[in-house]
Amino acid sequence: KDDVLTLLIHLGYLGYNSSNQTCYIPNKEVIDSFVNSIRSSNWNETTKALLNSRALLEATWNRDEELVAKYIEEAHLDTAILTYNNENALSYTISIAYIYARNHYTIIREMPSGKGYADMVFIPKDDKPAMIVELKWDHEAETAIDQIKEKKYYCGLEKYLDELLLVGISYNKETKEHSCIIERYR
């Protein structure tokens, strides 16, 4: 990925902002060309999934629990899992749903921490909050938050405690609905 971006920067198709280490499209001509290529491509589903993933991440940062549950629900419907009947299937869906987060985080699954293993830990690469995501299959999302606290999954993340989000995501197999609770670490 970095090699391609570097090449596009050297060719003048992209600019680089060194203060926040991001790429941008430098002029209207290149923007128009980019927009036309996206419009004429067959990447509609991929583009939608990436936009939803970005919106999911922003909803998580904003602690919009209902919107997070909605985007997880959409990701679940888009994944081709034959049997959505355990926490591993839920974990797969969450990994796909948060694919955009890789731009801002190193994501560690089953991270040893405190008195057990946190399902997913998002360690920031930039100024975003760290996140611990705990998944529950057929239990309340509050149970996931309680487990994060009781098992002290935040151990090892001391430098992020001022900006740490605890995220509990659950799936109810009877109602076939996802729920979410997001708290700041205190």
Please name every model-derived segment.
Residues S170-E177:
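Short, conserved secondary-structure transition motifs
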